[in-house]
Amino acid sequence: MKAHFGVTVWLGVCCSMTLLMVVIGGITRLTHSGLSITEWQPIVGVVPPIGDEAWLREKEKYAQTPEYRHRAADISLDDFKRIYIIEYIHRLFGRALGAVFCLPIPYFAITKRINRAMVAKLLMVALLGGMQGAMGWFMVKSGLVDTPRVSHYRLAGHLFLTILLFSILWHSFLRCAGVRSTTTTTNARFFTAAAVVGLTVLQMVLGALVAGLDAGLTYNTFPLMDGAIIPQSLFSAKLWHGGFLHDVTAVQFLHRLVAVLIVVCAAPLPFWLKTRGAWLFLACVALQFLLGVATLVSVVHIFLAAMHQVFGFVTLAAGVHMLCRLRREGSTCISGHAGIS
């Protein structure tokens, strides 16, 4: 039995908006627009600058940032407006997503279209959404102090919260849409499939570290790095003493290594599980791998990089869908009516 149609559509819209938010966030980062707004004003920040005086005030605030001093000291007002608007759209869309998600919850709860367990789950998502907004500002603040870019660790944390939010929303949507656990498989195969999906999440976080360090702008060949599969600089004692995840070479190598590992581990899944979901997941993994290589050799072309980022979420969605269709031996079938009373 499916959940109320309106609930299913609403969750589908929220999932779609989250993916669009990922695209906007990627474009914001790739165009170096994220540090153009130097204040966090959740309410009054909805209104953009109006008039030349207001724009000049915003540009003056931007002039106090490390990014302006190191990278954009000669930026014109028109160019500043362009990057400001990109970040403004990013923040405004985040507010819109929060409103679209939060406002219908009381109505669905009062009209009994969702049960108490679902209400609790959705309120947890709303709380995570608030944390995500705060994490976004925490990330931006790291680029307003000394260095002209945000902390790659905070960027990874920001992305991980998005992954968590999207996964919960997508799983809820699938269950409300009536997706059932209909294919029985062994515990070993189920947990192998789950581990590959977990590796996908790890790879997405590593991708955020690569992006935060601008590591994609180096070693723009594949499969070799500096003429070798394993670059010699990885064996430097200085690297290990200075911090492995601070090093551009190390982080990019890890991202490459996990990508290959995911492809190798995902390849046998369709033959083990014998489901269309496993084939879809493998296809997404393969396409995402090719997008990653294309992004690298193009020296991070904006379109390819944005598609690579959002397709990571598409691959994750395919993985979650694959797992939702599986039932371990000895377990009971999980029905698809988790959203109704």
UniProtKB/Swiss-Prot annotation:
It catalyses: Fe(II)-heme o + 2 A + H2O = Fe(II)-heme a + 2 AH2. The keyword rRNA-binding does not apply. It comes from Anaplasma marginale (strain Florida). This is Heme A synthase. Catalyzes the conversion of heme O to heme A by two successive hydroxylations of the methyl group at C8. The first hydroxylation forms heme I, the second hydroxylation results in an unstable dihydroxymethyl group, which spontaneously dehydrates, resulting in the formyl group of heme A. GO terms for cellular component: plasma membrane. The chain crosses the membrane at residues 7-27, 92-112, 118-138, 159-179, 190-210, 253-273, 280-300, 302-322. It is found in: Cell membrane. Its EC number is 1.17.99.9. Keywords: Cell membrane, Heme biosynthesis, Iron, Membrane, Metal-binding, Oxidoreductase, Transmembrane, Transmembrane helix. Belongs to the COX15/CtaA family. Type 2 subfamily. It is an enzyme of class 1 (oxidoreductase). Its main location: membrane. The keyword Transmembrane applies. It comes from the Bacteria. GO terms for molecular function: metal ion binding; oxidoreductase activity, acting on NAD(P)H, heme protein as acceptor.
